[in-house]
């Protein structure tokens, strides 16, 4: 709308247009605060759902679970293997059952087994020959003996060869001789068997002297020692060879008749008859044990006893093993289970181990395996529960932070809605003349922020004062000047109580002398509890009585201004129609003044109103600490110049502080935005610290130059 159209339109139409524009601005601000963007809608626009992101803690939880299960599984496998090892040690070492009749009671399972007595006597006692058949036929030797030998068997065949006439006196049947056996039948009386012991395969010669009557013919004893009892022995294959003991020979001799003769004896009646030769029993002695020589002592292992057995085939080394070992050289371990099975009467219980030491070692090894598995399981369980607790704490922290962000978004939207409904009256600004006004017109009265809200100070004759109307250009310039640019989000609203989050930039006023505002006073308004206090410059005629009382009550006041925060943006952007109606109200002749960025406390001294006779100027500056009312005009100008110098120094110091603060804020903001992708949405990107400081310095210096030019006029 052009200025002419604005001048022609009624005041109500202008107010309605401004109200509609501000309504749209407020809606956009509310949508931006809610995070919905420009297309967010109006007051009732719902907050868009946030994107759900998969948390890394869940994946790490599953990985930790698998990392804990795998060692437990391996531990159980080890336990099973150890049990199988124990079973193999106890059960797998038991040998097959060995019959007890083939095992010596002395524990010599591999040694020959000796019988105390023969099971039966040899048959056909009337004959002089006892033969033992073998698997291989015998070969007769030159001396009349036949013998055969297999690798593991020794057998002996004894034969009797008779060289006599075909007929023997007193016998009907001739004696037949064969190379294998000799049979003599005596019809008169049983033959007399004489006990003779002769060397193996020995026979009588034809020229031998016959024995005396009644005396047995004997020959020399063998050169090797004999045992008291002749027994049969197992030689590698346990093949028996039966012989007669001396006691049995004596019994047989005593029971025979002296009148009878055998093949080896003759009676006196037949002394002239030719003699025949025969062989007697020969005994194979296999029980001759001799200790081994010194060089053969190492033949038996595991403390076995070495001895030599001399047989017909030669000497053989044998080992008498200790209990628990077996084999040719005692090199095989034999558990006690074999001895239990072989001789259960010697053991009342069942023992599975070879000795107490072996048993203790095996029990200790199995116990160590089980204990190690339990320890590993405990450590794994503790690590799992600790990780689970940490993950739960992290999830709770993320949930709390997410709830805090949602709460901040909802709070900002609620504040914007409350600002739209609040009755804040922005007052129009009336541009004053550039030339100074004569004395005793306008003074300033100031009220400063305090913890409680400040009531508005009204004048009794304020309603009768004339109202100054302003052009739409002036109003738009004032609105444009009073609109703040949105500051970037900061994690802190104040920096250690020294400086707060400063505005990035204040729009330059279209009015060149915006910092030199002739006004009647400054009044403090605080319409909303959570917003900072605003200073408003109000134009009205001087009321000496009111001003005098006001100045006296404000002596020695301290400045304690709260810095503006991010919530001040909706304060100017969310205005409804009721707020804009105030432009045409009797109080529509004021403009907000930005308070000082520093938090200095200054004492303001105000003289009496009766001494004030010059023009007083209200300053709208970044660093206007205090405006003092002085008595004469010349003194006021001097104070203004001094104040400008002080103001420049203060501005430079504050610019330096703001630059450092914003650099730290930008660094923290950048780090937080990179770490948390779900940070709050920002309307504008932050400027670099150098650009900010340069623009602020240019803005402040330009304002000070304009102020100096006005004061020098």
Curated annotation (Swiss-Prot):
The keyword Zinc does not apply. Residues 1-362 are extracellular. InterPro entries: EGF-like_dom, Neuregulin. Signal peptide: none annotated. The keyword Transmembrane helix applies. GO terms for cellular component: extracellular space; glutamatergic synapse; plasma membrane; synapse. PROSITE patterns: EGF_1, EGF_2, EGF_3. Residues 288-331 form the EGF-like domain. One of its GO terms (biological process) is pattern specification process. Residues 149-163 have a biased composition (Polar residues). One of its GO terms (molecular function) is receptor ligand activity. Residues 384-713 are cytoplasmic. Disulfide bonds join 292-306, 300-319, 321-330. The cytoplasmic domain may be involved in the regulation of trafficking and proteolytic processing. Regulation of the proteolytic processing involves initial intracellular domain dimerization. ERBB receptor binding is elicited entirely by the EGF-like domain. PANTHER family: HEREGULIN-NEUREGULIN FAMILY MEMBER (PTHR11100), PRO-NEUREGULIN-3, MEMBRANE-BOUND ISOFORM (PTHR11100:SF18). Direct ligand for the ERBB4 tyrosine kinase receptor. Binding results in ligand-stimulated tyrosine phosphorylation and activation of the receptor. Does not bind to the EGF receptor, ERBB2 or ERBB3 receptors. Interacts with ERBB4. Belongs to the neuregulin family. This is Pro-neuregulin-3, membrane-bound isoform. It comes from Mus musculus.
